[in-house]
Amino acid sequence: MRSPTQPWSVDIPRLGFSDLTESKMWGISPIDQMLCRIKYRQAYYVGEFTPPTVNKPWIQYPGFNGGSDWGSIAYNPKNGILIANWSNTPMYNQLVARAKADQEGILPMDDPKFSAKKNGSIAAMAESPYAVNVQPFYAPITNVLCNEPPYGVVTAINMNTKKVIWQKPLGTAEHNGP
């Protein structure tokens, strides 16, 4: 479902893969895949613009480490070729009541005493009744992403024809395994 205030360009190829589904959950073993499917069912997910929820985790895809945020794009106006590096990384997020976060000593990121090393993946949100725990969507045992590789891709698009010229995985499985 698309919001009328956040439309996609209709004539330019989209970077990224289609929405996640339970059947697309992946693992390096059948147990991994099963545990990822269970985590998927336990979370709230309605596509790319899934809003945060209070009572259960939600899946953010692409996540904070996903999309074309690592290095952005390169464009050659002479030949109209755009090269984009993008990551395929979903996140598994959970809101935490601010009272609980305060009780555990979790500080907001704008506090001078905040330390990412101390807080890890959880941070209280300034002026909010919540903290948020942000994690990659990993399989519980192996800590491998629950979506199928590749986790990094480079895409070349001819902006004159609005067609993908080529698309290749970027990186190796060596650095993504347990």
Task: Cite the ranges covered by each PLM segment.
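Noncatalytic, solvent-exposed loop/strand surfaces
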Residues: M1-P178
